[in-house]
A protein has these predicted regions:
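Loop-rich catalytic cores of soluble enzymes, especially ATP-dependent carboxylate-amine ligases
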Residues: 1-109
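Substrate-recognition/cap regions that form aromatic- and gly/pro-loop-enriched pockets
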Residues: 111-113, 118-173
Length: 173
């Protein structure tokens, strides 16, 4: 967090914390990218999702372009100058996934074979549970995910996406 504004408090000589914060990892000081701030990736349809991800990978981000791909010694210091360097850099609270062989791109796997599972990224460990999450909480999460998968719902609008993002920020911070 050096050089970035934050409202964390010192815990000791080397650590910071925020009382009541639920997930620093998913907050604005965690796995976030200002380059992704204006992406409008929704989960209405796999093809639409993949088109948006591909666009984010192939659309240059000025700050990344200015860095260049290699440093002064010719060593790579970034993969590309795209808004997303690779698919796995999409920092969202949930991501469709499919495991594949080493070297296969997540985009290609999802396009060719579809979704195998969802990566739910907004869940942190429960410090009160030795395993990090209880069996009951996993089962509840399973039920919620199954319900969402089988219940028909309307497509996510731009306004709804914006509200979800605002709610995420409010809940995390």
């Amino acid at each position: 967090v050096d050089g970035r504004g934050n409202d964390l408090e010192p815990l000791n000589d080397s650590d910071l914390f925020k009382k009541g914060a639920t997930s620093l990892r998913m907050s604005e000081i965690g796995y976030q990218s200002k380059a992704q701030k204006n992406l409008n990736i929704k989960y209405n349809d796999l093809d639409e999702f993949l088109d948006e991800v591909k666009s984010a990978i192939t659309t240059p981000y000025p700050e990344f372009e200015n860095l260049g791909l290699k440093d002064s010694e010719g060593e790579f210091h970034q993969i590309s100058s795209g808004i997303l360097q690779i698919e796995n850099e999409l920092y969202d609270c949930i991501r469709p996934k499919r495991a594949g062989s080493s070297g296969e791109r997540p985009y290609d796997l999802l396009k060719k074979e579809g979704i195998k599972y969802l990566e739910v990224r907004g869940i942190d460990l429960d410090p009160e549970d030795l395993a990090g999450i209880s069996k009951d909480k996993i089962l509840l999460l399973d039920l919620i995910m199954l319900y969402c998968a089988i219940k028909p719902s309307s497509l996510m609008s731009d306004k709804e996406k914006s509200i979800i993002e605002s709610n995420d920020i409010a809940a995390i911070n």
